[in-house]
């Protein structure tokens, strides 16, 4: 099962890809008020499972990878793509 996104991860992901709350709302088809409300809390975002899935898909589609808390803390990063792979 995929761990829920935290508000800190959501804010950090938007910052990495330089999206506004409106950009994320449009990409995820989730209301901008829902995006803003989700980002002001600490911890897991208080949205429906369907909205969280839509937000995750939009951010992952923009190249974001979510990092679970594995002792080093949760976070986000750019997903490794073909362009970043070392050439042989």
Segments the model singles out, each with a brief description of its role:
Residues 13, 27, 38:
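Residues in the recognition helix of alpha-helical DNA-binding motifs
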Residues 9, 34-37, 58, 75:
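Residue-level recognition of specific faces of alpha-helices
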Residues 30-47:
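Recognition helix of helix-turn-helix/homeodomain-like DNA-binding domains
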Residues 1-5:
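A detector for short, charged/polar N-terminal pre-domain segments
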Residues 64-88:
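Helix-turn-helix/homeodomain-like alpha-helical modules used for DNA recognition
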